[in-house]
Amino acid sequence: ANLRRFVEETRQKGGIPVLFNSVVRRCWYAENLKNDDDEKLRKTVFDGEEKINSDTLIDTHGAYVVAPRCVAQELNVPFVDATKITHDIETSLGIKGSRSLHMWYKPGEVPSIPKGRMDNTHYNVYGARIIAGALADAIGKAVPALGKHVRHYDYVVSAEGRGNFMTL
């Protein structure tokens, strides 16, 4: 219902609605993660990943990623498959390389996170930039009228996520 409302309201205001499904979680665990608590799942780490038992990125969203595609087809709205795009990026980097996209920090590495973090859901600044760029390109392909506005800028942000310095 909310996706349909979003599309209707966007069209009423003269906008171009584009629907996305979810980005993937960095989850290489073939063990069945029977956990409907998103916060616990976000923090799921099996002893620093020594127990990884899959070389395949495992879906953690289930049917949730299908609904936006169905609504997009039903309402004739452009659709961006963020699940596939991010799955391809994560798998191209592999188990260890994909950490570079996420909030994986050792204790003391980032002042604002003194205890460190092993977060397989949220992107760090580098990961956010990579994913945002890929998704912006996908919007440009899905909606050529918007594609001419897609830009990729260089920018500098400190490890703490502070700063707003761009070069054109």
Task: Give short role names for the model-derived ranges.
Residues 1-147, 168:
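Alpha-helical cap/lid subdomain in secreted, periplasmic
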Residues 142-168:
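N-terminal secretory targeting modules
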